[in-house]
A protein has these predicted regions:
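Immediate post-signal-peptide N-terminus of mature secreted/exported proteins
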Residues: 25-72, 148-161
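Bacterial N-terminal signal peptides that target proteins for export
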Residues: 1-10
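Sec/Tat signal peptide C-region and signal peptidase I cleavage site
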Residues: 19-25
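Compact alpha-helical subdomains of small soluble proteins
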Residues: 72-161
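Bacterial N-terminal signal peptides
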Residues: 10-19
Length: 161
């Protein structure tokens, strides 16, 4: 089960962590937290996200190397603006049909729902408050595909630098 957790973590936040240093979800505004919780994961968004991960792959070496530096914004919009500040990121995401904000929103929703899927698999596990079972089911349905994406983004994880 821990391997599933690690893969989920890598797939959803590795790129953002590499760009932003550790941005902690609880530091987001209430509006951002609610937006992430209310986001509906879809096949169309996953297709764009998959394309985005592949388009961002060549940019991994351009990412900031200081993972301990805390320059991250405390909002979804601020974090997206920081991503857009990395040369080539905005264009790569646009070519995949996403904005940096959409990429982050999908990523963090995926992370949240992956964690919920993991929690439900634990003895006595219950669906966390505010988490949609439809999103957990989406995550479970696409788990193999997400693991493959996780391998692509693994090198950007601060723990792997």
């Amino acid at each position: 089960m821990f391997n599933t957790f690690q893969t989920t973590l890598a797939v959803t936040v590795a790129f953002a962590l590499a760009l932003l240093a550790p941005v902690v979800a609880q530091s987001l505004t209430d509006r951002d937290t609610n937006e992430i919780a209310g986001y509906a994961l879809t096949d169309a968004a996953l297709a764009k996200y998959t394309k985005a991960v592949h388009k961002l792959q060549p940019l991994m070496e351009q990412l900031p190397q200081d993972c301990d530096q805390d320059e991250g914004s405390q909002s979804l919009d601020g974090t997206a603006a920081r991503m857009d500040g990395v040369p080539g990121v905005k264009a790569a995401l646009k070519a995949a049909g996403m904005t940096s904000r959409e990429y982050l929103l999908f990523s963090w929703s995926l992370f949240q729902n992956g964690m919920a899927a993991w929690a439900l698999e634990q003895p006595g596990g219950k669906l966390p408050p505010g988490v949609k079972m439809a999103n957990v089911n989406f995550y479970r349905k696409h788990e193999a595909e997400l693991k493959k994406l996780g391998e692509l983004t693994k090198q950007a994880d601060c723990d792997n630098r």
